[in-house]
Amino acid sequence: MFLKIHPSRETGDVVAVCDRELLNTTISHEKLTITVTDAFYGNTPATEAEVKAALKNAGNINLIGERSVNIAVEMGLVDKHCCMMIGKVPHAQIYQL
């Protein structure tokens, strides 16, 4: 997985995580298209433990890919049924209010 933390004092850090094979690809389904860029998701490889630590402290979370989303599901941060599917790729956005 790749992990990038976007610091934000107003809303808490934005944590972006994507599965390795999705970086720098474009995923489409019907009218929705998402390009998974290293500018947003980073290019720093992260272990599952590093991803979990980052998610614990996040104000906002953006996840794309089976492994990335499953970590948040296992942590109880999101219900798998609430995740959007872009084709066969799960995507989740989690916001603290």
Residue positions per predicted region:
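Solvent-exposed alpha-helices and their adjacent loops that cap or buttress functional pockets
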Residues: 6-10, 53-56, 84-85
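Fold-independent oxyanion-binding glycine-rich loops
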Residues: 18-20, 64-67, 97
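Mid-chain, well-packed structural core segment of small domains
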Residues: 49-75
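C-terminal structural segments of small proteins and small subunits
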Residues: 71-97
